[in-house]
Amino acid sequence: LRRKPGMDRSDLFNVNAGIVRNLVEQIAVTCPKACIGIITNPVNTTVAIAAEVLKKAGVYDKNKLFGVTTLDIIRSNTFVAELKGKQPQDINVPVIGGHSGVTILPLLSQVPGISFSEQEVADLTKRIQNAGTEVVEAKAGGGSATLSMGQVPG
């Protein structure tokens, strides 16, 4: 289920949690050694659901289950580059935490060669944390942030 205007990532939980659970149950049976990258929102909780399903099936490996939040890094690099008049590929903002609102934490103090005022840190952090909502509202619910998905045969 994709986000629509007025929804946040947690609104997707009821539908997406069931989808992730069903898919991971099948993975546990058909390809128990698979590396699993989860991008389904809310990533913070869908990864935990996947882990529990894999544990229940007796095939959980903490080194093979990933929550994909690279989008937050790309957005952070882009916003910092915009603000500082640089190219996004020349910026590297470490981002820790989850992929849901205030759990997204850009480590702006760790960006090499760039300093920020307290106001810039506050404004950038808020923009990065709310970027997903900004995209959904700009698209008026008319699409998904996902370019494509694929299934690799086991």
Swiss-Prot record:
The keyword Metal-binding does not apply. GO terms for biological process: malate metabolic process; tricarboxylic acid cycle. NAD(+) binds at N16, I39, T40, N41, M149. GO terms for cellular component: cytoplasm. It catalyses: (S)-malate + NAD(+) = oxaloacetate + NADH + H(+). Its EC number is 1.1.1.37. InterPro entries: Lactate/malate_DH_C, Lactate/malate_DH_N, Lactate_DH/Glyco_Ohase_4_C, Malate_DH_AS, NAD(P)-bd_dom_sf. Changing V111D: In strain: WPP25. Changing S117N: In strain: WPP3 and WPP8. Substrate binds at R3, R9, N41, R75. It holds the Pfam family Ldh_1_N. Keywords: NAD, Oxidoreductase, Tricarboxylic acid cycle. The active site is at H99 (proton acceptor). The keyword NAD applies. GO terms for molecular function: L-malate dehydrogenase (NAD+) activity. It comes from the Bacteria. Changing V152A: In strain: WPP24. It is an enzyme of class 1 (oxidoreductase). Belongs to the LDH/MDH superfamily. MDH type 1 family. Catalyzes the reversible oxidation of malate to oxaloacetate. Homodimer. This is Malate dehydrogenase. It comes from Pectobacterium carotovorum subsp. carotovorum (Erwinia carotovora subsp. carotovora). The gene is mdh.
